[in-house]
Amino acid sequence: LPISQEIPGVTNSDFLRSAMNARREKPLSLYQFIKAMDHATEDLEMDSNLAHRYLNEGFSGGEKKRNEILQMKLLEPKFALLDEIDSGLDVDALRIVADNINEMRKTKKEDFGLVMVSHYERLYELVKPTHVHVLVDGNIVVEGGFELIEKINNEGYEWVKKELGIELQKEDEDVVSIGVCGHKVTSNV
């Protein structure tokens, strides 16, 4: 999904309709698009006027995050990377975003893969990952399930450093956890 950049002069609805039609063999009619847009904005409890505003221009942090999920819902990618989608969301907005992510996971099943990056357990409590990985210097150093998130939440990352004997440089102290919420395995056998 695109980064939440402001694009003056391009309305949210024009951007989304163009992006949706670029992914389809036959373009959506205006009626079909409006129906899909209305349904998705209603699911995300977004103001319907958002469609007529310029893309991300003047959007609050929460509106940008919901707009990213709106794009995901309408574009229906096979794979999505949500980088700190919980950043700047209040409790209610986080629940709405998580509910919409879970709905996509439920309805798309094996046709949708998702990687979420967050520094906070609260997102992972609402969107339960199937796999959890801890990265240091771009390398996966620890893998597990939800219990790994609980351990990190309770003990921090200090145990990772001690257990694996990892010495982090000052600029490398930002360890990031990633929860993979779905994956599709294919084989060429």
Regions found by a protein language model. Name each.
Residues 154, 160-189:
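ABC-family P-loop ATPase nucleotide-binding domain
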Residues 126, 135, 139-164:
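Conserved beta-strand-loop-alpha-helix hinge in the C-terminal portion
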Residues 81-88, 92:
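Walker B catalytic motif
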Residues 115, 131-133:
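Conserved catalytic/dimer-interface elements of ABC ATPase nucleotide-binding domains
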Residues 90-95, 143:
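Conserved D-loop-proximal element of ABC-family nucleotide-binding domains
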